[in-house]
């Protein structure tokens, strides 16, 4: 059972996990772990399932998925019957009113929907993956020089599950460098997997870029793929100015993660998020929601 902190009710909700039995089997049973290492974590598995989700045959999965996870389609730009396939639904866009944004210069917003963890004063060689597990930022982006600039800074981990809105956005106005791709495996990013695979973020497929923001300095954006996420699509134009809240890109089917690194003393994350992280809980947030300030 995964408990998530709800900022509105100040209580904990139990996360509905898509494919929970499969995840438990793959990461907690001897046979499942063997199958995971031999096949599930490999590109071929995610590619095959991704091809299915791109096909018209997958369209019939949409309504059942919406009903099972109680997804509010009134926030979506399309009706159910307008989606061409499951990936079209999965990467759905929302109405502008669905995710209000505070455009105040001193306010930091969430880059997407998901479950947020915040770690302050980070050690580059011991960045927290989940309580009890760490990884190296230098290894994550394969660029020690860039990584060193974020020593003592703040790390935000936004975990998306398959039921979430899967587009990610810019947290401020500014310009972003071209995204650098790093090949890797396709482990799940569910906490069950994070508790069973050391340095998971450094093993999975990922992309990173430097966003030069107007109000929070240089921000390191990292997008991490996961099981069945065969594609991370960047929709922004490198070095072209963007506005706060504009789309940066999106993930195709599967759970996935966005990680942001801020330099030391450039932001202050809201205290409830920091406190819940220390207690071992993620906080549910939506794109555009205020999560910190200068």
UniProtKB/Swiss-Prot annotation:
Catalytic residues, chain numbering: 113, 169, 256
Main location: membrane
Cofactor binding description: Binds 1 pyruvoyl group covalently per subunit.
The protein's Enzyme Commission number: 4.1.1.65
Pathway membership, UniProt: Phospholipid metabolism; phosphatidylethanolamine biosynthesis; phosphatidylethanolamine from CDP-diacylglycerol: step 2/2
Signal peptide: none
GO biological process annotation, one example: phosphatidylethanolamine biosynthetic process
Pyruvic acid (Ser) modification, residue list: 256
Swiss-Prot/TrEMBL site (Cleavage (non-hydrolytic)) positions: 255-256
InterPro entries: PS_Dcarbxylase, PSD-B, PSD_type2_pro
Keyword Lipid biosynthesis appears in the UniProt entry: yes
Transmembrane segments: none
Keyword Lipid metabolism: yes
Catalytic activity line of the entry: a 1,2-diacyl-sn-glycero-3-phospho-L-serine + H(+) = a 1,2-diacyl-sn-glycero-3-phosphoethanolamine + CO2
Molecular function terms from GO: phosphatidylserine decarboxylase activity
EC main group: lyase
Cofactor: pyruvate
GO cellular component: plasma membrane
Record localization: Cell membrane
UniProt membrane topology term: Peripheral membrane protein
Record PTM: Is synthesized initially as an inactive proenzyme. Formation of the active enzyme involves a self-maturation process in which the active site pyruvoyl group is generated from an internal serine residue via an autocatalytic post-translational modification. Two non-identical subunits are generated from the proenzyme in this reaction, and the pyruvate is formed at the N-terminus of the alpha chain, which is derived from the carboxyl end of the proenzyme.
Family: Belongs to the phosphatidylserine decarboxylase family. PSD-B subfamily. Prokaryotic type II sub-subfamily.
Self-association state and partner proteins as the record states: Heterodimer of a large membrane-associated beta subunit and a small pyruvoyl-containing alpha subunit.
Free-text function comment from the UniProt entry: Catalyzes the formation of phosphatidylethanolamine (PtdEtn) from phosphatidylserine (PtdSer).
Protein name, per record: Phosphatidylserine decarboxylase proenzyme
Species of provenance: Clostridium perfringens (strain SM101 / Type A)
């Amino acid at each position: 059972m995964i408990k998530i902190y709800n900022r509105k009710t100040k209580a904990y909700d139990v996360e509905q996990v898509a494919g929970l039995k499969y995840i438990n089997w793959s990461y907690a049973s001897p046979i499942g772990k063997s199958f995971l290492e031999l096949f599930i974590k490999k590109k071929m598995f995610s590619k095959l399932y991704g091809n299915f989700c791109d096909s018209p045959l997958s369209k019939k999965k949409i309504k059942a998925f919406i009903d099972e996870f109680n997804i509010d389609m009134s926030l979506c730009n399309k009706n159910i019957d307008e989606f061409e396939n499951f990936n079209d639904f999965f990467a759905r866009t929302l109405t502008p009113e669905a995710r209000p944004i505070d455009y105040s210069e001193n306010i930091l917003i969430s880059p997407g929907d998901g479950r947020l963890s915040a770690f302050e004063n980070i050690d580059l060689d011991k960045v927290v993956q989940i309580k009890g597990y760490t990884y190296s930022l230098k290894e994550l982006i394969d660029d020690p020089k860039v990584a060193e600039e974020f020593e003592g800074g703040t790390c935000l981990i936004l975990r998306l599950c398959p039921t979430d809105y899967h587009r990610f956005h810019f947290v401020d106005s500014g310009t972003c460098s071209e995204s650098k791709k790093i090949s890797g495996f396709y482990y799940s990013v569910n906490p069950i997997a994070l508790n069973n695979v050391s340095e998971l973020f450094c093993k999975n497929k990922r992309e990173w870029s430097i966003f030069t923001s107007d109000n929070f300095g240089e921000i390191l954006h990292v997008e991490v793929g996961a099981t069945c996420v065969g594609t991370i699509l960047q929709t922004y134009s490198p070095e072209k100015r963007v506005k706060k809240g504009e789309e940066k890109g999106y993930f195709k089917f599967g759970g996935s993660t966005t990680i942001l690194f801020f330099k030391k003393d450039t932001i202050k994350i809201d205290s409830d998020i920091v406190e819940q992280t220390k207690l071992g809980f993620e906080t549910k947030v939506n794109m555009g929601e205020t999560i910190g300030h200068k």
